[in-house]
Amino acid sequence: KIDQQNEYFILVSPGDDVCLQESANMHIVTVNWPSYPLWEQIGLPLALKKIKPDLLHCTSNTAPLHCPVPLVLTLHDIIYLEKRQSSSQSWYQEMGWHYRRLVVPRILPKCKKIITVSQFERKRILEALHLQDGQLVAVYNGFNSHFHLQPKAPEITRKYIDSDNYLFFLGNTDPKKNTPRVLKAYSEYLKRSEKKLPLLIADLKEDAIDRILEEEKITDIKSSLRFPGYIANTDLAALYSGAFAFLYPSLRESFGIPMLEAMACGTPIITGNTSAMPEIAGEGALLVDPYHPEEITEKILQLENDNQFYQQQIEYGLERSKLFSWKNSAEALLKIYKGLTR
């Protein structure tokens, strides 16, 4: 929408074009290879030799080791370069970890420009990889426009939870998502709260939840948990809007799009005071030490017991989320593209 002069080719795997729309100067090209490493290292360079673009922008941390055109890379984070993944990682996640550790250090010197998603991550990357300062820039992410303040939609929320008021948490087996401490914080909340709101946990299977509850010796809270598993992206806005608060106290994030989605829907967030979360959520957000479950509990209770403070957090989130959009991101990227193709 912001550039009608240049021509763009979006290269995707089969089936990955469902959310994309072609236009006069935007073309979708399907590249068919059986696995992602082969797709990126063989299929993508072959397709580029046919298209002959002025530059390639790879948007997900890795790129072809032998790229036939000038390369721009978005490096979202370097978590996989900093530490070994935990034993809870799936086989697919483990292979992805090895692939990134192999590819990333080898392609960075070949990049004309490297983009990351926050000033926090930019600083970490510069320190860890000793890049030239001008080679690495931060361009903030945006979030989809269908996340906005809207009336409650019980016809959607009741598909996932049998309550009109609840706490909302995007669960994950990734240790950085801090699921065990969130559940410990919720256990303490149930002991101290008069309202005892249920906790809706998205995208986490019951067996994974059961393991955490048993390890933390808090199996008694299971009846207050709702775990529908996968939640369609089209339903997320309604679930944010229906939630009393959104819990996002990760141990580490390079950006944290869900925080902005919840804020834009008028839902107060509780997030971590580490990594990029204070930068994105801002100083007015409810920031906690994610390693201390009692801090998470206290913030939930503060929201519950102080309606004026609760309303202030709603207003703060609505205003804060206006600072971020994909249009802003696209304009920043276009400026980079033009600078490299003059």
Predicted regions and their residues:
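Carbohydrate transferase catalytic cores enriched for Leloir-type hexosyltransferases
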Residues: 1-342
